[in-house]
Design a protein with these regions (language model features):
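Extended, well-folded catalytic/binding cores that form a central cleft or groove in large enzyme
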Residues: 1-173
Length: 173
């Protein structure tokens, strides 16, 4: 059993790298424990984290861009099982049914779309309703806003704020 701990938030890049290596080694989802760093529990027998370090060159997976984007949004959800669900769906797309995402009655696909929808809604609310207040900090203008997202959606909207407010000093707390 492989245990992989994702330490970054939301963890897409780290998850993608670990998933590529595990898919290349054909490790089925039921033989992997994917968890976030803040949900790590001590193993009863103390076996530490293992990485899927592949001895052979990484295979070039060809996954539809729409599937990758769906996984990226779902990985921003706050559900602790998001990494395992996304790996299970990726495994099924690669080894079982390349058109899995079009199967709207599949339980994993339903859950994946629901998670992505919740994250998109959260990200939309941030860009639509977030309001900055001007403060003076060391004699300079600074704009501060407070937002508490339900999911890890802040990274998805950083580009929006950087381009919209590129000439301002701002912070989102």
């Amino acid at each position: 059993m492989k245990t992989i701990t994702i330490t970054s938030i939301p963890g897409f890049d780290e998850w993608r790298e670990a998933s590529r290596e595990c898919i290349a080694k054909r490790i089925p989802p039921e033989h992997i424990i994917l968890q976030s760093a803040h949900s790590v529990q001590e193993d009863l027998f103390g076996s530490g984290d293992e990485q899927c370090e592949s001895k052979r060159p990484r295979s070039n997976l060809s996954i539809p861009k729409s599937t990758v984007m769906l996984l990226k949004y779902a990985l921003c959800h706050n559900d602790e099982n998001r990494f395992a669900l996304c790996y299970r769906v990726l495994w099924r797309v690669v080894y079982e049914n390349r058109q899995l995402i079009q199967m709207k009655t599949d339980d994993d696909v339903i859950q994946l779309f629901a998670m992505a929808k919740a994250v998109k809604r959260d990200a939309y609310k941030m860009s639509a309703f977030l309001r900055f207040r001007e403060i003076s900090l060391e004699g300079q203008e600074h704009f501060v806003a407070w937002y508490e997202p339900e999911h890890f959606s802040l990274e998805l909207k950083l580009d929006f704020f950087q381009t919209r407010f590129k000439n301002m000093r701002w912070s989102i707390l």
